Each structure stands twice: as structure tokens, then as C-alpha cells.
């Protein structure tokens, strides 16, 4: 066994991977983590909701508060015959640790814990507070997870100063990318009403597909905004269109369209809703439209947290990191409501949600070292 596969972070990552915590089942991961943190003086609060396990852990009672956030749940393994080794039996081969959750994001959680253990052992009287916010409902509908903890904290006026979400953000090598924000996500379910009829007698019917087509073309052609330094322009995409009975001689009576905005911080959800309705109304459509806002955009500028994490990456692995807001949503969108500086950082994401998910062995302990250096920078009087 190599040094990379015998360290404390590797060992804890394997313990977590071996628990088949398919969302929303925590499978005892939070209890394992709490048992590691209890001797360090952490206080624990379970904020479980509707079968979802949520843990808030904090050491210290003063500011600044540095929180590590993440999720213990994983996506289903998929067809087992596609895996070269059982997905919940951590396996080492070819310089990689394989298993469901290895990259997304049990190695990050293990790295949080071991970084905290070393930091507290060396600096038991550090300034401020260390916190962990963990959930088993990130890969699912995410309505009973992190958002419930944030609501509880906000309800008693508790705020965070810095938060690192351990999502796998690196692209080619550990440390090359920090996510310092995410676009918002606004979805719509549109039902265009027509009149069903026989295709041979279109004058006796109203085809909702034909009526919607010009509006679709206009919506698809709109440049919603120009983006900004950190965000690309807002996009509008149709994901599903459904109409008809399956017969080729029946004009459908309704057409259902599912679409999604991924929007930059320069646009608001209300503005996008209003502009969409203007287009639909201008085309004279008879319609119903239901909206779902699953996440507002958030952005962390080049402040103390970005600087501390970037320096930690450079000092540990010699990589000059880049800031990015690309990709989907994360639980950072909830945490941003109670924290001004939220970033995501973790291992390479090339295999997440795939068969044979893995993390590089030689990235595991360095990831923990990066988190520890970030603690040093933000919770020691002189930042060292």
C-alpha cells in the first residue's frame, strides 16, 4: 500500500464510500463524522426533515465563522455490470480510488474532517468558529436538506462569514478551478390550449403546436442579457415538448412545454418571468404557465475567502487557480442567504455520476492540506 492510500483522509473516505448512502439515505455517515468531531469540542444539532438527515456542527461561539458544507448522499450506482468493481466497495487501482461518491463528494468530507482534526490539535485556541453543514438531500430534490438548516440558522439570526462547499470543482488537476458563484435556475411548465380535431378539418380545430411555434422561435432568439465579468449571458432552453395522442390524424388539444433559464446575476427571476409573459401574450396564446425557482444566482468576489483558498492551493500543489461560475446549481445557493462569501472547491469532477467514479490517490491528502491552510489563513490571528 502506498503512502497516498494509507493516510487518515484516505481511510475516512473509504469508510464513507463503503456506506451506500443513495439519496436521501445517509446510511450512518453523519453519525460517523460526529463521532470524529465530538472529541474536538464540537456542538451538534440535527435538523432532520421528512426522512432527510441534516447535521449542523460548530466549535466556538465567536466570529469569524468558517463553515465547510457538503452532502453525504450519492446518486444511484446504475447498472452494476458497468462497474469494474462494486460501487460501494472502495477499490484502489491505477493510482485511483474507485467507488460511488469518491469524487462527489465523500473525499471532500473526509478532507474537511482530517483538516479540522489537525488544525484543532495544533491550534486549540484559534479565533472564531469552525462549522460543518452536512445533508443527505443534495442529489435529490434538495427541499429538505441544506435549505432547512439555513432556515433554522436564519431564524435565530446566526450568520456565517465564510463557507467552502466541497463540490468537485477541479477540471484537469486538483486546484485548477474554484467556483465562486453559480447561475440561477428558473423553470417553467407551459400549457398552450387549442381545440382538438381531425387533421382533415383544421378549420374546425386550433393547433396549439402551430400557435406556439412563432413564440418559440422568438423566445429562442432573445438575448436576455450580456452577462458580466463572472457570468456568461443568461440562456433559455426548451427541455421537453409534448402534444398529441400518438395518432397521426388528430390535431392535439394542448401542447405542454418545459423550459429553463440559467440566469446571470445581472437579471432577476421576476424580470425573466415578466419578459416571457410579454412574448406569449403578444402572440395571442391561450395558456397557463407555472414557474419554479430552484436557485437564485450568487457570486463571491475576490475577498478574503477566495484569496485564502487560492493561496492554499498555490502553496500546497503549486497551481494557479481560476475562478468560474459554470455548471449547474449547488447548495451554495441556499447558504449564500446567510453568508457573504461562499465558494466551492474539491477534487477533479471528470467521473462524477458515472460508472467507475474515482478520485486520484495523490490528490486526497493534498485536498485536506488545502482545507487546513485555509483554516490557518482565516482563523489564526496572523493567518499562519
Swiss-Prot record:
A Pfam short name: Peptidase_M20
Catalysis: reaction(s): N-succinyl-(2S,6S)-2,6-diaminopimelate + H2O = (2S,6S)-2,6-diaminopimelate + succinate
Active-site residues, as the UniProt record annotates them: 73, 138
Gene Ontology biological-process annotations: diaminopimelate biosynthetic process; L-arginine biosynthetic process; lysine biosynthetic process via diaminopimelate
Entry binding sites for Zn(2+) 2: 104, 139, 353
Leading EC class: hydrolase
Signal peptide: none
Enzyme Commission (EC) number: 3.5.1.18
Cofactors required: Zn(2+); Co(2+)
Pathway involvement of the protein, from the record: Amino-acid biosynthesis; L-lysine biosynthesis via DAP pathway; LL-2,6-diaminopimelate from (S)-tetrahydrodipicolinate (succinylase route): step 3/3
Co-factor binding details: Binds 2 Zn(2+) or Co(2+) ions per subunit.
Any GO molecular function: zinc ion binding
Binding site for Zn(2+) 1: 71, 104, 167
HAMAP family linked: DapE
Family assignment from sequence similarity: Belongs to the peptidase M20A family. DapE subfamily.
Protein function: Catalyzes the hydrolysis of N-succinyl-L,L-diaminopimelic acid (SDAP), forming succinate and LL-2,6-diaminopimelate (DAP), an intermediate involved in the bacterial biosynthesis of lysine and meso-diaminopimelic acid, an essential component of bacterial cell walls.
Protein name: Succinyl-diaminopimelate desuccinylase
Native source species: Aromatoleum aromaticum (strain DSM 19018 / LMG 30748 / EbN1)
Amino acid at each position: 500500500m502506498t503512502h497516498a492510500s494509507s493516510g487518515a483522509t484516505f481511510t475516512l473516505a473509504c469508510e464513507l464510500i463503503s456506506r451506500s448512502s443513495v439519496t436521501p439515505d445517509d446510511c450512518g455517515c453523519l453519525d460517523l463524522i460526529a463521532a470524529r468531531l465530538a472529541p474536538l469540542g464540537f456542538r451538534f444539532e440535527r435538523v432532520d426533515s421528512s426522512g432527510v438527515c441534516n447535521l449542523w456542527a460548530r466549535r466556538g461561539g465567536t466570529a469569524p465563522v468558517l463553515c465547510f458544507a457538503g452532502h453525504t448522499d450519492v446518486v444511484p450506482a446504475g447498472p452494476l455490470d458497468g462497474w469494474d468493481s462494486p460501487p460501494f466497495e472502495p477499490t484502489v487501482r491505477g493510482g485511483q480510488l474507485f467507488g460511488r461518491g469518491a469524487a462527489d463528494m465523500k473525499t471532500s468530507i473526509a478532507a474537511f474532517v482530517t483538516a479540522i482534526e489537525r488544525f484543532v490539535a495544533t491550534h486549540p485556541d484559534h479565533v472564531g468558529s469552525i462549522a460543518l453543514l452536512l445533508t443527505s438531500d443534495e442529489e435529490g430534490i434538495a427541499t429538505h436538506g441544506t435549505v432547512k438548516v439555513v432556515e433554522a440558522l436564519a431564524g435565530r439570526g446566526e450568520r456565517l462569514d465564510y463557507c467552502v462547499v466541497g463540490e468537485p470543482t477541479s477540471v484537469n488537476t486538483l486546484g485548477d478551478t474554484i467556483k465562486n458563484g453559480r447561475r440561477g435556475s428558473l423553470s417553467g411548465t407551459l400549457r398552450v390550449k387549442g381545440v382538438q380535431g381531425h387533421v382533415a378539418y383544421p378549420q374546425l380545430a386550433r393547433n396549439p403546436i402551430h400557435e406556439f411555434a412563432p413564440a418559440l422561435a422568438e423566445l429562442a432568439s432573445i438575448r436576455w442579457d450580456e452577462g458580466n465579468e463572472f457570468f456568461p449571458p443568461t440562456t433559455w432552453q426548451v427541455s421537453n415538448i409534448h402534444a398529441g395522442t400518438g395518432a397521426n390524424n388528430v390535431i392535439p388539444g394542448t401542447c405542454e412545454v418545459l423550459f429553463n433559464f440559467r440566469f446571470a446575476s445581472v437579471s432577476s427571476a421576476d424580470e425573466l418571468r415578466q419578459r416571457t409573459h410579454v412574448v406569449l401574450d403578444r402572440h395571442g396564446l391561450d395558456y397557463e404557465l407555472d414557474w419554479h425557482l430552484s436557485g437564485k444566482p450568487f457570486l463571491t468576489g475576490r475577498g478574503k475567502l477566495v484569496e485564502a483558498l487560492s493561496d492554499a492551493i498555490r502553496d500546497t500543489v503549486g497551481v494557479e487557480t481560476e475562478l468560474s461560475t459554470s455548471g449547474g446549481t449547488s447548495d451554495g445557493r441556499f447558504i449564500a442567504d446567510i453568508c457573504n462569501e461562499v465558494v466551492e472547491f474539491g477534487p477533479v469532477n471528470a467521473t462524477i455520476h458515472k460508472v467507475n467514479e474515482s478520485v486520484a490517490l495523490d490528490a486526497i491528502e493534498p485536498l485536506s492540506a488545502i482545507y487546513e491552510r485555509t483554516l490557518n489563513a482565516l482563523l489564526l490571528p496572523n493567518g499562519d
